[in-house]
Amino acid sequence: MTGQLVQYGRHRQRRSYARISEVLELPNLIEIQTSSYQWFLDEGLREMFQDISPIEDFTGNLSLEFIDYSLGDPKYPVAESKERDVTYSAPLRVKVRLINKETGEVKDQDVFMGDFPIMTDTGTFIINGAERVIVSQLVRSPSVYFSGKVDKNGKKGFTATVIPNRGAWLEYETDAKDVVYVRIDRTRKLPVTVLLRALGFSSDQEILDLIGENEYLRNTLEKDNTENADKALLEIYERLRPGEPPTVENAKSLLDSRFFDPKRYDLANVGRYKINKKLHIKNRLFNQKLAETLVDPETGEILAEKGQILDRRVLDKVLPYLENGIGFRKLYPNGGVVEDEVELQSIKIYAPSDQEGEQVINVIGNAYVEEAVKNITPSDIIASISYFFNLLHGVGDTDDIDHLGNRRLRSVGELLQNQFRIGLSRMERVVRERMSIQDTNTITPQQLINIRPVIASIKEFFGSSQLSQFMDQTNPLAELTHKRRLSALGPGGLTRERAGMEVRDVHYSHYGRMCPIETPEGPNIGLINSLSSFAKVNRFGFIETPYRRVDPETGKVTPRIDYLTADEEDNYVVAQANALLADDGSFIDDNIIARFRGENTVVPRNRVDYMDVSPKQVVSAATACIPFLENDDSNRALMGANMQRQAVPLMQPESPIVGTGMEYVSGKDSGAAVICRYPGVVERVEAKNIWVRRYEDVDGQQVKGNLDKYSLLKFVRSNQGTCYNQRPIVSVGDEVVKGEILADGPSMEKGELALGRNVMVGFMTWDGYNYEDAIIMSERLVKDDVYTSIHIEEYESEARDTKLGPEEITRDIPNVGEDALRNLDERGIIRIGAEVKDGDLLVGKVTPKGVTELTAEERLLHAIFGEKAREVRDTSLRVPHGGGGIIHDVKVFNREDGDELPPGVNQLVRVYIVQKRKISEGDKMAGRHGNKGVISKILPEEDMPYLPDGTPIDIMLNPLGVPSRMNIGQVLELHMGMAARYLGIHIASPVFDGAREEDVWETLEEAGMSRDAKTVLYDGRTGEPFDNRVSVGIMYMIKLAHMVDDKLHARSTGPYSLVTQQPLGGKAQFGGQRFGEMEVWALEAYGAAYTLQEILTVKSDDVVGRVKTYEAIVKGDNVPEPGVPESFKVLIKELQSLGMDVKILSGDEEEIEMRDLEDDEETKKADGLALSNDEDAADLAPVDLERDAVTKE
């Protein structure tokens, strides 16, 4: 027997074919959400309050500071928040101090700053009762970027951009004449020397001394027509503020506020880190020839001679001295924006681009600006300009903006922080205004602060941001993937239209950080990705992946694990996880396949620095659930990963016989299961609750402590209308540990993800019914409820106050017989358990109609009988088309009972209808390898082909679906599944480290099957064997959310569009099928004149004709002649509105009168046919007409 037994949770053992031992546990898969939000509560909020404090008024004698904050307890627990349609949030209170500097008076006060949405334990938010997820955003990191460009004449040049977190951009570029230009904040370009002069390096000589003598700088100085700092400042001011009269003082303050004011310009922590890293001098000195002698400033010791090459060894020796002051220079700019001294680090080297090797260039670094400085400094600007000139001489590297070292994640915490900042800065403006208006002696912090803008900006973010999404809750895997999603779209990100091929493509730096497989098909491909299984996010927002450290001395793999970002990884050689290791951790082979900067190379074993942790660190959680992934083509694997998220939870879930071992972790971390919070023993188990007696440590002894109650969700509607149901899997007396699964969620079995069912599949054709990927299925799967799922739909009806009086929920509805009311209770609300069909009443409701001027008699009746004479119309809630089922639950909310309802609503009734959907023709099914198809025929069990032992198979798939798609994984799964079924075991075949072909054949032999895994099949109809042996086995098949019940649609009479009077389109509007231009040509080609005329008139927008036709059909008369279609009248009105006098003439030149809609007597009857734009009329249409037709008789 190959493989070894592995335990997954308490209830499942699998035979694992993995050869590589797991050295690292998978992290908690929703940590990206929870830890980011925790950071926001602990530090993010504090940062915001510190940034904005103190707020001072315009005179400077009042100052308001935010000292501390605290979050209270949520008003309702999670379940109740969902039920009441409120936001799950906690009150935020801030301690505010107001200081009056004139009197020295200090006032402290606790100020309520609104309710702040709280993240649930499972990484989601509940906003207005709906569960939402904040998706992490991939954006370009703030930094300085250099890139090469080639102009139209083929000349190579460069561009550079300094991108802040917020603030003005600075861009450098060269032109065809080798002049270096700068653009400030996307304005017109200026020679770069103008910017240097404006900073305070005013003379040509100063600039040449600073940057170093070279032809590019000479060209730029020639182009520059400013002589001193003042002229340069005026020049820049004219570019930034065209049309305003320039003065030197204004120009100074403008430039100062644009770049050196922390409120206007912010690099953030990550920007400062990236700029310091990029402008550090050492990267440009590596392997360059020195043009000066480096001397230790303290001892006078010579560290490196002039003319020496700075290789890795010399550079490592010089590095500590570089950081302690070699090459440091202090500059004293004058007359420009910068008043203080500027510290730089500069070292001279010979330009590698120069053939003679004589040209000396200056390499300038920014002299290690402190991390706390979040805005750009003059030394950053000079160093970036220097880097640009160095690039022109072949020193330095250009950047790849698609590299994950240059893209970072904004997770929940940071997105919230940015939103909160917007709210606070709006509030700051209000506070300043109020400070100057109100009396300074009596004022309190509470009176100054207006929390509206803060609350509004948070509400706006959760309610309408592109990154705040309605959670995909189809099944646990969909939930998990949604929380781990990375989007490049959204505010501050890319747009679909602008994103090119490069951004979407797989990049070598994605390895172990972003899944190369799981991404949507369609316009968002490559812009929305999924986090890899082992990846983490560091404090700067860069994605890190774990590697095993190789000891450089001994060459052995150590137990130490380092998390590396993409740009750190570029410095190391990394071996794959499948490199063979001896017992002591040394590499067995002399040459190892390894990666270095995106190249796969073979290196000697002593060159390896790190090794992969696991073969599945490349892929995401969903992709890691596909067994034999290594045998599938990537395009099909992408579909497989995406379709698992669309699996509908079944009534009887079953985990896969052939799994990957990832099912347990995915189920546990998704948030769908009930997880034990403390170790203990199970005391009581019910369908709805589990009680666990906690174990507590007292003086090293285990003592029984508190009793914890875990509530289970039973038959709740998920966001997608699937059934969310939890089932206990522990028994009384079980000892449980922290983190253990107590109850399965939807699509889970025995603690593992269970999206579909294991069914017996044969690869064969059958009378052409499985043409084009169609699926033939046995009726047994329908009878035994194998693929039956439960769907819950929610309908609501609200009684509002209208201008004519309040609406009323009642059983007393006009023109409705007692039979239709049989299932309503005395309140007029349907009873739980009733079975309803399309069009049945759910909630009886009447709305007052407009009362016209009453006659004297009516007024008398009104006076005698009171309100009764008032006209009401029926606006009851009815079951929509295709919505029939059983009433599962009814919830009633009343304003009188103190329920929070929207303004103007007095009563709200929610009705839940549950449907049990068996699988049927037209439903979509799929395997895990992207092999999807639609059920074309459900055969009786006796007609299905059967095995020699008489077992009929369950599903027939077309063998032609395999070769061209190249997803051979499904065939291996089929064979392995059959062997496992015979052996009575479950299998784990992890991705990239699963069962090899040889293992499959061995397992087949162990199970007593033939090595080709084929078998003779007999035709169920004739009993004859088929000519050839057929591959039959167990495959895991999933029923997808695309069900035929949701898609099938037919219209009788229904609503019409207001202007054209044509039927609406789409199932949701109960619309018709569009008969378009090309369809008209088809009927014309056949000469079907009457059919065509009918379709274009009485079946569409001949208003009078359609009423008469309906009437004729009801009475059994002949159908009348069609009239003029409404759209023709619209066309004429259109032409008349353009000032053309249009007349219609008959064949003998006589004008035809076209009566307008209003004055047409015939259309009075059409009121019943939903010609009004009142939606309720649509439902009543046929009834009214019949009544109308009867009265005419």
UniProtKB/Swiss-Prot annotation:
Keywords: DNA-directed RNA polymerase, Nucleotidyltransferase, Transcription, Transferase. GO terms for molecular function: DNA binding; DNA-directed RNA polymerase activity; ribonucleoside binding. The keyword Lyase does not apply. InterPro entries: DNA-dir_RNA_pol_bsu_external_1, DNA-dir_RNA_pol_su2, DNA-dir_RNAP_su2_dom, DNA-dir_RNAP_su2_hyb_sf, RNA_pol_bsu_bac, RNA_pol_bsu_CS, RNA_pol_bsu_protrusion, RNA_pol_Rpb2_2. Residues 1152-1161 have a biased composition (Acidic residues). It catalyses: RNA(n) + a ribonucleoside 5'-triphosphate = RNA(n+1) + diphosphate. One of its GO terms (cellular component) is DNA-directed RNA polymerase complex. It is an enzyme of class 2 (transferase). Residues 1184-1193 have a biased composition (Basic and acidic residues). It comes from the Bacteria. Its EC number is 2.7.7.6. The keyword Nucleotidyltransferase applies. Pfam families: RNA_pol_Rpb2_1, RNA_pol_Rpb2_2, RNA_pol_Rpb2_3, RNA_pol_Rpb2_45, RNA_pol_Rpb2_6, RNA_pol_Rpb2_7. GO terms for biological process: DNA-templated transcription. Residues 1152-1193 are annotated as: Disordered. The RNAP catalytic core consists of 2 alpha, 1 beta, 1 beta' and 1 omega subunit. When a sigma factor is associated with the core the holoenzyme is formed, which can initiate transcription. DNA-dependent RNA polymerase catalyzes the transcription of DNA into RNA using the four ribonucleoside triphosphates as substrates. Belongs to the RNA polymerase beta chain family. PANTHER family: DNA-DIRECTED RNA POLYMERASE I SUBUNIT 2. This is DNA-directed RNA polymerase subunit beta. It comes from Bacillus pumilus (strain SAFR-032). The lineage of its organism: Bacteria, Bacillati, Bacillota, Bacilli, Bacillales.
